[in-house]
Amino acid sequence: MIQMQTMLEVADNTGARHVQCIKVLGGSKRRYASVGDIIKVSIKDAAPRGRVKKGDVYNAVVVRTAKGVRRPDGSLIKFDSNAAVLLNNKLEPIGTRIFGPVTRELRTERFMKIVSLAPEVL
């Protein structure tokens, strides 16, 4: 469950380390984002020679949440931290590698690239 001001780790190789959610996209009254939702983020911490720099604003898709994802069979998939993957304006991933596991909920037409790059799909 991600809302405005939430700090997230970055799960790709764009050079960003931590980002802050500045908006949950998808309706004017939308308050929370979960796995698979698109948010607007600001880069708070970045590597010196990365693709992105501190202060830049990007779209990102949430790939892991500490709150977890409830499956139809009743199981709950939780993670230790919140993580996102940075996207460009066409909603394609900027990075070429994904770090850590992602959930099966990302397996939609929009995010198949992220699922295929991920080392593990839970």
Curated annotation (Swiss-Prot):
Q: One MF term in GO for this entry?
A: large ribosomal subunit rRNA binding
Q: Which GO terms describe its biological process?
A: translation
Under the heading NCBIfam families, the entry gives: rplN_bact
Q: So which domain of life are we looking at?
A: Bacteria
**Species of provenance:** Chromobacterium violaceum (strain ATCC 12472 / DSM 30191 / JCM 1249 / CCUG 213 / NBRC 12614 / NCIMB 9131 / NCTC 9757 / MK)
The record's function comment reads: Binds to 23S rRNA. Forms part of two intersubunit bridges in the 70S ribosome.
Family membership: Belongs to the universal ribosomal protein uL14 family.
Q: Which SUPFAM superfamilies match?
A: Ribosomal protein L14 (SSF50193)
What is its quaternary makeup? Part of the 50S ribosomal subunit. Forms a cluster with proteins L3 and L19. In the 70S ribosome, L14 and L19 interact and together make contacts with the 16S rRNA in bridges B5 and B8.
Protein name according to UniProt: Large ribosomal subunit protein uL14
Entry GO CC: cytosolic large ribosomal subunit
Q: Which InterPro entries match?
A: Ribosomal_uL14, Ribosomal_uL14_bac-type, Ribosomal_uL14_CS, Ribosomal_uL14_sf
The record's listing under Pfam families reads: Ribosomal_L14 (PF00238)
**Keywords associated with the record:** Ribonucleoprotein, Ribosomal protein, RNA-binding, rRNA-binding
